[in-house]
UniProtKB/Swiss-Prot annotation:
The lineage of its organism: Bacteria, Pseudomonadati, Pseudomonadota, Gammaproteobacteria, Pseudomonadales. Transforms N(2)-succinylglutamate into succinate and glutamate. Its cofactor is Zn(2+). It is an enzyme of class 3 (hydrolase). It comes from the Bacteria. This is Succinylglutamate desuccinylase. It comes from Pseudomonas putida (strain ATCC 700007 / DSM 6899 / JCM 31910 / BCRC 17059 / LMG 24140 / F1). One of its GO terms (molecular function) is hydrolase activity, acting on ester bonds.
Length: 335
């Protein structure tokens, strides 16, 4: 296997390879771009016109997606996977990956779309670097652009594998992309309705990629991910890389759609979230339930039918989102 296929090993040891470019027997070119960043370019005659960005390790303790990217890269490097798409593999937060921690100083997935310019420290610098990797990768005109940012979570979930689809005014969410997600094993998709500061929101809003945050199960240490079943996703990613997907895929069978009803914003240290600490994502909340309270008698009461909560976190910094209230979506606005 080509040495550059061992990107995870290089990242874990903070090692810079002596040889920055290698070529597979099939003509695919592997190029090391910087720490945790490697581009795969197919032979020119095989190029299908897709640029695929696969990122993992934005949070350093979310290891199952990192291991998945490592398997895919090994497959390319040993010739078992024959790429027809350009692929950029990114390990988002190398320092946190080495420590097995979510982050070093602050959550890097709250520092995109310009937020890093308002901050300082290691993660702010890395967020700017990741944006630049993506900006250069997606700079070629006339090509299809797709970004999957892969995550796992400490919190349990009623729906284990789901995607978040970013928002941009005037742009419709794609039914074709949702069908692709359904085929990849996603059980639900949250259709977002406002701009965000995550990595996938940056590539969707600023770089015109189809982009998604994929939540894939529980976060566990390296080598302990047997219960995180990524078989369908891995199979689909190989088909995307090799350009062997079915044509005109449109079935959304088994895929639940949700939209954001409200975001719960923590305004002060007096904020209190009235939920059990171990509540699972997608837990249903009854109408009339007092969800949260803050200063000046600010109250969040559930008014929506079929409401569910995701990403509840009362420990976030003031001014940030402490939870999202979501409701079922009919999908009538899909493009």
């Amino acid at each position: 296997m080509l040495a550059l296929g061992k990107l995870l090993e290089l990242t874990l040891t903070a090692h810079e390879p002596a040889e920055k470019t290698q070529v597979t027997p099939g003509g695919a070119r592997l190029r090391w771009l910087g720490e945790g960043a490697l581009e795969v370019r197919p032979a020119e005659s095989e190029d299908c016109g897709l640029d695929l960005l696969l990122s993992a390790g934005i949070h350093g303790n979310e290891t199952a997606p990192i291991e998945l990217l490592e398997r895919l890269l090994h497959g390319v490097a040993n010739g078992k996977i024959k790429p027809r798409a350009r692929v950029l593999f990114l390990f988002g937060n190398p320092a946190a990956i080495r420590k097995g921690e979510r982050f070093i100083e602050q959550d890097i997935n709250r520092l995109f779309n310009g937020r890093h310019e308002l901050s300082s420290g290691f993660e702010a610098l890395r967020a700017a670097e990741l944006e630049q990797f993506a900006r250069v990768f997606f700079s070629k005109p006339g090509r299809n652009r797709l970004h999957y940012d892969l995550h796992t979570a400490i919190r349990g979930s009623k729906i284990e594998q789901f995607a978040l689809y970013p928002y941009k005014e005037g742009r419709k969410h794609s039914r074709r992309e949702l069908a692709r997600l359904a085929a990849a094993g996603m059980e639900a998709v949250l259709l977002q309705s406002k701009s965000s500061i995550t990595f996938s929101a940056f590539t969707y809003e600023q770089l015109e990629a189809e982009a998604f945050t994929l939540e894939l199960g529980k976060a566990r240490p390296f080598g302990q991910n047997e219960q995180v079943n990524l078989d369908k996703l891995e199979e689909r990613l190989i088909r995307i890389i090799e350009a062997t997907e079915p044509e005109n895929e449109s079935s959304l069978d088994g895929l639940q759609l949700f939209s954001v009803s409200r975001e719960i914003i923590k305004h002060s240290d007096s904020f209190h979230l009235h939920l059990p600490a171990d509540i699972e994502n997608f837990s249903e909340l009854s109408k009339g339930y007092l969800l949260a309270e803050d200063l000046a008698e600010m109250r969040w009461v559930v008014e929506e039918e079929g409401a569910r909560i995701i990403f509840p976190n009362p420990k976030v910094k003031n001014g940030l989102r402490a939870g999202i209230l979501i409701v079922p979506d009919s999908g009538q606005r899909l493009g």
